[in-house]
Amino acid sequence: MITTRTARQCGQADYGWLQARYTFSFGHYFDPKLLGYASLRVLNQEVLAPGAAFQPRTYPKVDILNVILDGEAEYRDSEGNHVQASAGEALLLSTQPGVSYSEHNLSKDKPLTRMQLWLDACPQRENPLIQKLALNMGKQHLIASPEGAMGSLQLRQQVWLHHIVLDKGESANFQLHGPRTYLQSIHGKFHALTHHEEKAALTCGDGAFIRDEANITLVADSPLRALLIDLPV
């Protein structure tokens, strides 16, 4: 079953220095029916103005994945670690209790645009505090997984996350690990097909909940960039 969540249905924020779109309840935006999906707690697309920053703050025990779409960011923690990431890279922070984290748009004249996901972390798992990955702009790229398969970032949760880039008319098929998946369009138009021949059309910024499907096929109706988040738990 596919249930779409269009960009227009998402929460919105504009603070001047920050513009944001929230898939799930976040900050001032609250919907009791949308507190997350399985272990996916947050899925935001945010634009930080030139020179803007998120001041240091602590987090619940989550893995925070930032996919940089445009610009360059710097991340610091209270333990003295810091790393930079730019467009075409993904950065994973394995947050720790009592440690604060900040984010800064390094450019003085260019906005920073990124997708940010929070995933519940298994308390028994301890992974590297910071991991970075260059995105392969090919058809399919596994960018995060529980065991760091195929050179992907290693998560503290049973989640598989794919970065998808398709030309118009191309398709990609995914075998899913469990009953829940979330699909997020970054840009482009496409349709998703299930083995029950259910079809859903999505465009730039739209998302979709996928339930109880063994596999899913994506067909690009225009040049497409998207994320597929396979969430068995």
UniProtKB/Swiss-Prot annotation:
Induction (free text): Induced under conditions that maximally induce expression of the large pathogenicity island (PAI) also called the locus of effacement (LEE).
Pfam families: Pirin, Pirin_C_2
Knockout-associated phenotype: No effect on protein secretion by the type III secretion system (T3SS) encoded in the locus of effacement (LEE).
Keywords: Cytoplasm
Location of the protein in the cell: Cytoplasm
Top-level division of the source organism's lineage: Bacteria
Gene3D superfamilies per UniProt: Jelly Rolls
First-listed, main subcellular location of the protein, grouped into a coarse class: cytoplasm
InterPro entries: Pirin, Pirin_N_dom, Quercetinase_C, RmlC-like_jellyroll, RmlC_Cupin_sf
SUPFAM superfamilies assigned to the protein according to its UniProt record, in alphabetical order: RmlC-like cupins
Disulfide bonds: none
GO cellular component: cytoplasm
Family listed: Belongs to the pirin family.
Reported function: Does not have quercetin 2,3-dioxygenase activity.
Quaternary structure annotation from Swiss-Prot or TrEMBL: Monomer.
PANTHER family, per database record: PIRIN-LIKE PROTEIN YHAK, QUERCETIN 2,3-DIOXYGENASE
Protein's recorded name: Pirin-like protein YhaK
Lineage: Bacteria, Pseudomonadati, Pseudomonadota, Gammaproteobacteria, Enterobacterales
